[in-house]
Amino acid sequence: MSAADIATKRIYEPAAAPDGHRVLIMRLWPRGIRKERVDTWLKELGPIPTLLRDFLDERVTWAQYVPRYLAGLERPEAQAAIAEVRRRAREGRVTLLCGCADEQRCHRSLLRAYLLDSPRARPRSPRARAPRGPARRRRA
């Protein structure tokens, strides 16, 4: 999976062909958005309601929000949703959608980075093999 396979976009921006498979990653359905504008809704990838409320009410800073959101991605239901996004990304481009206006301080950018930086996203490298041929003994 490469950076080109996963994009992010605000749900209120018009859909476009390059978006590929559009995945909404909010716990609540956004107002005014028709279901036809989204291919898949994975609410398990949205921040838990208490974390989002604390962040919006400024009881939690962005620096505190980030590790708490990422920790939430380790929940089994979130991991199942992440597996779905990875599967879709192997088939073609995926666009992660959210209602946040500021992409830099939004969970969609955190999720994209998580998907791209996670060991499961990296191509598997060939295993190191032992040298072939007769074994060499070390001299004492």
Features from the language model and the residues they span:
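Residues lining hydrophobic/aromatic ligand-binding pockets adjacent to catalytic sites
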Residues: 1-140
